[in-house]
Amino acid sequence: MVKSKSPKGIYAARKLRLKRLKFRRSQRKYKTKILKLKEKYDPLGGAPMARGIVLEKVGIESRQPNSAVRKCVRVQLVRNGRVVTAFVPGDGGVNFIDEHDEVIITGIGGTLGRSMGDLPGVRYKVIMVNGVSLDALYKGKKQKPVR
């Protein structure tokens, strides 16, 4: 039998922990965090939400086997000037959004911050328009203020 190189004993916890720390660089999450890749490459800069100005409304075709034109908007972020595509959820949600409106976007909820479902290349969704939630606008609880 080959003897294990790991310490075994009542007081071995520190030694075992330090041994594990040597292999952390091979873990994807640790490497992303330590190299600050989220802040560098994420348009939102690691933040949960961002404010932006609507440049145009676009219809994006969904992937197979679905067939639909999903309503999206091109948004220029205020914080860094980057342009991203954001999905507008809900039935008739795009009717509440006009060009040059101020919107708040957040992640769409895909795995590892990527796109979700049948929307190719869309990582964000609109949650607020001119300071009013999109949900309140659908339900008729509030009206959209004019900027």
Curated annotation (Swiss-Prot):
Gene Ontology terms: biological process:
translation
Cite a single Pfam family from the UniProt record.
Answer: Ribosom_S12_S23
Entry-linked InterPro entries: NA-bd_OB-fold, Ribosomal_uS12, Ribosomal_uS12_arc, Ribosomal_uS12_euk/arc
Task of the protein: With S4 and S5 plays an important role in translational accuracy. Located at the interface of the 30S and 50S subunits.
- Oligomeric form and interacting partners: Part of the 30S ribosomal subunit.
What is stated as this protein's family in its record?
Answer: Belongs to the universal ribosomal protein uS12 family.
Q: Which HAMAP family match?
A: Ribosomal_uS12_A (MF_00403_A)
**Listed name of the protein:** Small ribosomal subunit protein uS12
The source organism is Saccharolobus solfataricus (strain ATCC 35092 / DSM 1617 / JCM 11322 / P2) (Sulfolobus solfataricus)
* Taxonomic path: Archaea, Thermoproteota, Thermoprotei, Sulfolobales, Sulfolobaceae
